[in-house]
Amino acid sequence: MTTTINPLMSPHKTKKVIKLVPPDGGWGWMVILGTALSNIFNVSMLSLFSLVYGDALEAMGHKTQGAAVVLSSMLFVSNFGGPVAGAIVKITSPRFTAVMGACFCTVGIFFSGFSTNIWHLVTTYGVLLGIGLDCISNSTFVSINSYFKQRKSQAVGLANVGTNIGQMLMPHVVRYLLENYGFRGTCLLLSALSFNGVAGCLLLQPVKIHMKKIIEEVTVDETIYSLENEQFHMVVVERPDLNQELPKCNKQQTEMQLVNRSKINVSKESTDKLETTSPNKNDSFEEGKESNWLRKLYDLFGIVLLSDIRFINIVIGTALTTTSIANFSLVYPLFLQNAASLDKQQTANCMSAVAAADMVGRLTLPVLQDKFKIKARWMLIMTAIWVIVIRQILAHQTDVTLLLALSILYGFGRSMTVVTKNITISENCKSELVPAAVGLGMLSMGIIAPPLGYFLGWIRDYTGSYIACIAAQNALLVILLVTWLPDMLYLHIKSNKEKKTLDPIKVFTKM
């Protein structure tokens, strides 16, 4: 087989350039440590709600539905404010936003101890703690995402280990505090512990001061070298004659012209025409100013992402998953105490077993994901199936040994739903849109969680059955599978077709 070689084409010319890349480690490990420290005392409060506030809500005359109202209000605020938190991260920095969030958490837990009715809890735990968790969640993920590229899943998993440590230790701490200091004293001491999160958030330094320098060979534009070799170039003149042929230039002229090749000249006639048809300068300035303002808002909140149907499908799916997991965390301690008839010590043991297995899962499953190059969406689908099966079996058990074993299995599967939630969103958008994408994901959670959380609480109170409530929680994960699996299979088939199309091209180029 013979091929024709274009005489203008030259061999590939390369040059070495210094490129700044994320460290994929380095100070990033300190960022993970700071995030974990903040999660121990703040994010873990989500799973402690029933232990801390359960008896107080009963004294106020409220049952599962009342608890669902408070928890749903917190989820609504923490997620509905996602775009705002993303905008604050862009305008200021992840560190500032995280410190602000830790302060909100401390204030919210402190004042919740003085609650005398459910609306006090909605204001303190729901609103103040919700704002704090919103800021912490968004800013810490953006910071970790900026430090890690290759080992992102492992980094997020390690950072979330702090939440697991809090979920393992804090139930026993809360039980001890409630027995010795009462509800109000417990809230005051928990707020003091929460303030330690500020120290962790201060470790979130900007990635730009820790960027790693690498030397990379890049291919120089071959067209420029082809023109240079043949000594051809367009000469820019003030009043060009369209019928005149472009002259040849020597090499020195060519190099100077190439530097300025982006200049554009227009004829006097076309300039005059533009001047006569241009609108009023003041009107043009005002319109440009308004358009610029709208463009900034458009870019700040990442509105362009909403035009992508796949992105919308992803954020709705992650919102359904988070709602299901969060609602089970609310119901599980009540199920253990009321349906399985366990005491507070046994309940705390089961919750600690969930947290311990969750921590093991966050340390091991991301490593397997990176090793086998599994997409975050596939990991979320597989763990959703795992969680559905385990929870449905668990709902029918009353033996403490079986409940401990199933708690371990559930915690192990639950780990990846937490780790992959934001990674799933960030995988499907550009890096500069990650803060906005995470914010929009939290917004969808804020829209979906309150009505669904209230509905799940109503099912429990109306039927009087924890089995029916847990089955309804699993139904949310079934919806995730129904909406995601067809899209993932379509992408898999499309990818295989593209590979088959490219293979003959590779063989042809080697001939």
Regions found by a protein language model. Give the residues of each.
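Long, low-complexity inter-transmembrane loops of multi-pass membrane transporters
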Residues: M1-L20, D24, A199-I316, D343, ...
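Extracytoplasmic gate region of multi-pass secondary transporters
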Residues: M45-A56, K296, F301-P366, L452
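Intracellular juxtamembrane helix-capping segments at the cytosolic ends
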Residues: A56, L133-F148, A155-V156, M416-C429
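Helix-to-loop junctions at the C-terminal end of transmembrane segments
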Residues: G81-P94, G361-K375, R460-D461
